[in-house]
Curated annotation (Swiss-Prot):
Superkingdom of the source species: Bacteria
Binding locations of NAD(+): 12-17, 36, 98, 121-123
SUPFAM superfamilies: LDH C-terminal domain-like, NAD(P)-binding Rossmann-fold domains
Name of the featured protein: Malate dehydrogenase
Catalytic reaction annotation: (S)-malate + NAD(+) = oxaloacetate + NADH + H(+)
GO function term, MF aspect, one: L-malate dehydrogenase (NAD+) activity
Length: 316
């Protein structure tokens, strides 16, 4: 019996797109189409990665292209196209430029791959998912934004480093928009099953230090932009998108914080924002409504309003 390999298209061949191509190949998740408007860049990266296959022992086809028709009938698409942040820029400074790119991407997904599961990575994330959704006409369960997985990973890493324990034993997640108003939920964080609030009571970490970690998580992307001086994070964002992709392709039904379309959940209407969802073979299979304390709810509402204003500023 012939097993048909999955077709995964990556739109944008920058640092994240190239890293994603390599990670997908190493995991043999499917054949890859790497698309970019820059002539030679996707072809060169695709060839470079393909030439490592005899060494690493992976069997996937990797195609670099500048033509949208090559994404036809993709099983999944990850969008990283657009300009990246530079020092001094906020994610929102990218809004108008990247919105034009997302419009073109959305229209081509509608034309060539209307049945794909789509993961958007381009910033400002929550607004860009809205633009792609608008122009692709995808069902809301088949389009999602990568933000919460990355923000939660940063939050967990910072907590583990401060506590000097394995990152594997930290469970925590971040809700809301992928920006300064994101909401790391201390209320739901735990260390090897023990609530973080109890860890604070035990004296293993102070509330002040946790508050500093929350703030560092909010500025996690900026910290890397400032260090790199030209470009933004790409290893952890790529890993985050892979985590979501695998849950879809392998029907893992993982609970992951992602920018999903809310239609009444959390009291929010018609907006993409970060919440915990179950991702399986049908895309977003369920949105989980987590109870927040008053201060978390207030922060979440502020985040919702911030994202809504950003989307509104794009106009019709």
């Amino acid at each position: 019996m012939t097993v048909q390999r999955k077709k995964i298209s990556l739109i944008g061949a920058g640092n994240i797109g190239g890293t994603l191509t390599h990670m997908i190949a190493l995991r043999e998740l499917g054949d890859v189409v790497l698309l970019d408007i820059s002539d030679g860049i996707p072809q060169g990266k695709a060839l470079d990665i393909a030439e490592s296959s005899p060494i690493d022992g992976f069997n996937v086809n990797i195609t670099g292209t500048n033509r949208y028709e090559d994404i036809k009938n993709s099983d999944a698409i990850i969008i990283t196209a657009g300009i990246a942040r530079k020092p001094g820029m906020s994610r929102d400074d990218l809004l108008q430029t990247n919105a034009k790119v997302m419009k073109e991407v959305g229209e081509n997904i509608k034309k060539y791959s209307p049945n794909a599961f789509v993961i958007v990575v381009t910033n400002p994330l929550d607004a860009m998912v809205s633009v792609v959704h608008k122009f692709s006409n995808l069902p809301t369960n088949m389009i999602v934004g990568m933000a919460g997985v990355l923000d939660s990973s940063r939050f967990r890493y910072f907590l583990a480093s401060e506590l000097n324990i394995s990152v594997e034993d930290i469970s925590a997640f971040v809700l809301g928009g992928h920006g300064d108003t994101m909401v790391p939920l201390i209320n739901c964080a735990s260390v090897a099953g023990v609530p973080l609030t109890q860890i604070i009571d035990m004296g293993l970490i102070t509330q002040k230090k946790v508050d500093e970690i929350v703030e560092r998580t909010r500025n996690g992307g900026k910290e890397i932009v400032d260090l790199l001086k030209s470009g933004s994070a790409y290893y952890a964002p790529a890993s985050s998108a892979i985590c979501m992709l695998e849950s879809y392709l392998k029907d893992k039904r993982r609970i992951l914080p992602c920018a999903a379309y809310l239609n009444g959940e959390y009291g929010v209407e018609e907006l993409f924002i970060g919440v915990p969802v179950i991702i399986g073979k049908n895309g977003i299979e369920k949105i989980l409504e987590v109870k927040m304390n008053d201060s978390e709810q207030e922060m979440f509402n502020k985040s919702v309003n911030s994202v809504r204003e950003l989307v509104k500023s794009l106009g019709s």
